[in-house]
């Protein structure tokens, strides 16, 4: 069983890397068009926050080096995505986006890490408390792409709900859910089980709207901007 869980964990790491890399096409489009258009920033902000804390969890928890390395990679990738957003976001939305980034990607991680180190004296308690926080954030991470559903329904187009991000989040939830079952790890099972079902929901929505009529572009060839954050 230990060998099986190891191999499942390795597969999970590979899929996690694909999750972190899946938005590359989206951000290449943003760079080419020099506009964030109607893409949502919140999913990447949430994923950066989650990856940062999972990296810390992997560092302070014995035997979890794979968790820290893959999430360290994820934190780096998401940082690049967020910086690209900040560079191309319309001026009217720049300040609001910066405030959210500072609150969720700087202030909250510092408070969470400092709080667990202050309130819990032994390493096991600190690890468990951080695991609980990370599990909660994972649920947010899996659900954050749902913020794009309003845009999909309004425009009847899946252009701004990236398929590969939803697909790999679905796979990620499935494989890590199996891994959690093998190890009887509730911190992993609950968020990844929910991620599995949320992934199915997103894929069903994508399938429903994928043949819809393209949205109408303005005279400059760009879609009018809407708030990046709901």
Swiss-Prot record:
<keyword id="KW-0762">Sugar transport</keyword>
<dbReference type="GO" id="GO:0009750">
    <property type="term" value="P:response to fructose"/>
</dbReference>
<protein>
    <recommendedName>
        <fullName>Bidirectional sugar transporter SWEET16</fullName>
    </recommendedName>
</protein>
<feature type="domain" description="MtN3/slv 1">
    <location>
        <begin position="6"/>
        <end position="92"/>
    </location>
</feature>
<feature type="transmembrane region" description="Helical; Name=5">
    <location>
        <begin position="129"/>
        <end position="149"/>
    </location>
</feature>
<feature type="transmembrane region" description="Helical; Name=1">
    <location>
        <begin position="4"/>
        <end position="24"/>
    </location>
</feature>
<dbReference type="GO" id="GO:0005886">
    <property type="term" value="C:plasma membrane"/>
</dbReference>
<dbReference type="GO" id="GO:1902334">
    <property type="term" value="P:fructose export from vacuole to cytoplasm"/>
</dbReference>
<comment type="similarity">
    <text>Belongs to the SWEET sugar transporter family.</text>
</comment>
<feature type="transmembrane region" description="Helical; Name=2">
    <location>
        <begin position="41"/>
        <end position="61"/>
    </location>
</feature>
<keyword id="KW-0813">Transport</keyword>
<feature type="transmembrane region" description="Helical; Name=6">
    <location>
        <begin position="163"/>
        <end position="183"/>
    </location>
</feature>
<dbReference type="GO" id="GO:0006995">
    <property type="term" value="P:cellular response to nitrogen starvation"/>
</dbReference>
<keyword id="KW-0472">Membrane</keyword>
<comment type="subunit">
    <text>Forms homooligomers and heterooligomers with SWEET1, SWEET7, SWEET8, SWEET9 and SWEET17.</text>
</comment>
<feature type="topological domain" description="Cytoplasmic">
    <location>
        <begin position="207"/>
        <end position="230"/>
    </location>
</feature>
<dbReference type="GO" id="GO:0009744">
    <property type="term" value="P:response to sucrose"/>
</dbReference>
<dbReference type="Pfam" id="PF03083">
    <property type="entry name" value="MtN3_slv"/>
</dbReference>
<keyword id="KW-0926">Vacuole</keyword>
<dbReference type="GO" id="GO:0009705">
    <property type="term" value="C:plant-type vacuole membrane"/>
</dbReference>
<feature type="topological domain" description="Cytoplasmic">
    <location>
        <begin position="150"/>
        <end position="162"/>
    </location>
</feature>
<dbReference type="InterPro" id="IPR047664">
    <property type="entry name" value="SWEET"/>
</dbReference>
<dbReference type="GO" id="GO:0005353">
    <property type="term" value="F:fructose transmembrane transporter activity"/>
</dbReference>
<keyword id="KW-0812">Transmembrane</keyword>
<keyword id="KW-1133">Transmembrane helix</keyword>
<dbReference type="GO" id="GO:0008515">
    <property type="term" value="F:sucrose transmembrane transporter activity"/>
</dbReference>
<feature type="topological domain" description="Cytoplasmic">
    <location>
        <begin position="25"/>
        <end position="40"/>
    </location>
</feature>
<dbReference type="GO" id="GO:0009409">
    <property type="term" value="P:response to cold"/>
</dbReference>
<feature type="topological domain" description="Extracellular">
    <location>
        <begin position="62"/>
        <end position="69"/>
    </location>
</feature>
<comment type="function">
    <text>Mediates both low-affinity uptake and efflux of sugar across the vacuolar membrane. Regulates sugars homeostasis in leaves and roots by exporting/importing them through the tonoplast regarding metabolic demand. Acts as a vacuolar hexose transporter, such as glucose (Glc), fructose (Fru), and sucrose (Suc).</text>
</comment>
<feature type="topological domain" description="Extracellular">
    <location>
        <begin position="115"/>
        <end position="128"/>
    </location>
</feature>
<feature type="transmembrane region" description="Helical; Name=4">
    <location>
        <begin position="94"/>
        <end position="114"/>
    </location>
</feature>
<feature type="domain" description="MtN3/slv 2">
    <location>
        <begin position="129"/>
        <end position="212"/>
    </location>
</feature>
<feature type="transmembrane region" description="Helical; Name=7">
    <location>
        <begin position="186"/>
        <end position="206"/>
    </location>
</feature>
<dbReference type="GO" id="GO:0006970">
    <property type="term" value="P:response to osmotic stress"/>
</dbReference>
<dbReference type="GO" id="GO:0055056">
    <property type="term" value="F:D-glucose transmembrane transporter activity"/>
</dbReference>
<keyword id="KW-0677">Repeat</keyword>
<dbReference type="GO" id="GO:0051119">
    <property type="term" value="F:sugar transmembrane transporter activity"/>
</dbReference>
<feature type="transmembrane region" description="Helical; Name=3">
    <location>
        <begin position="70"/>
        <end position="90"/>
    </location>
</feature>
<dbReference type="GO" id="GO:0051260">
    <property type="term" value="P:protein homooligomerization"/>
</dbReference>
<dbReference type="InterPro" id="IPR004316">
    <property type="entry name" value="SWEET_rpt"/>
</dbReference>
<feature type="topological domain" description="Extracellular">
    <location>
        <begin position="1"/>
        <end position="3"/>
    </location>
</feature>
């Amino acid at each position: 069983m230990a060998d099986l869980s190891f191999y499942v964990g390795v597969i999970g790491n590979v899929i996690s890397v694909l999750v972190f890399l899946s938005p590359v096409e989206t951000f290449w489009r943003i760079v080419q068009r020099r506009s964030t258009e109607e893409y949502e920033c919140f999913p990447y902000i949430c994923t950066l926050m989650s990856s940062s804390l999972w990296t810390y969890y992997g560092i302070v928890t014995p035997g979890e080096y794979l968790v820290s390395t893959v999430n360290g990679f994820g934190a780096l990738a998401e940082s690049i995505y967020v910086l690209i957003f900040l560079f191309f976001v319309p001026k009217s939305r720049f300040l609001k986006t910066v405030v959210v980034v500072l609150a969720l990607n700087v202030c909250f991680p510092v408070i969470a890490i400092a709080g667990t180190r202050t309130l819990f004296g032994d390493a096991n308690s600190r690890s468990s408390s951080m695991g609980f926080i990370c599990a909660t954030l994972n649920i947010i991470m899996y659900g954050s792409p749902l913020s794009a559903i309003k845009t999909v329904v309004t425009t009847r187009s899946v252009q701004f709900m990236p398929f590969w991000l939803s697909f790999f989040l679905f796979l990620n939830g499935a494989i890590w859910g199996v891994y959690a079952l093998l190890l009887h790890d509730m911190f992993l099972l609950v968020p990844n089980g929910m991620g599995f079902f949320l992934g199915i929901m997103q894929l069903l929505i994508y399938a429903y709207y994928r043949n819809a009529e393209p949205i109408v572009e303005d005279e400059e060839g760009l879609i009018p901007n809407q708030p990046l954050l709901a």
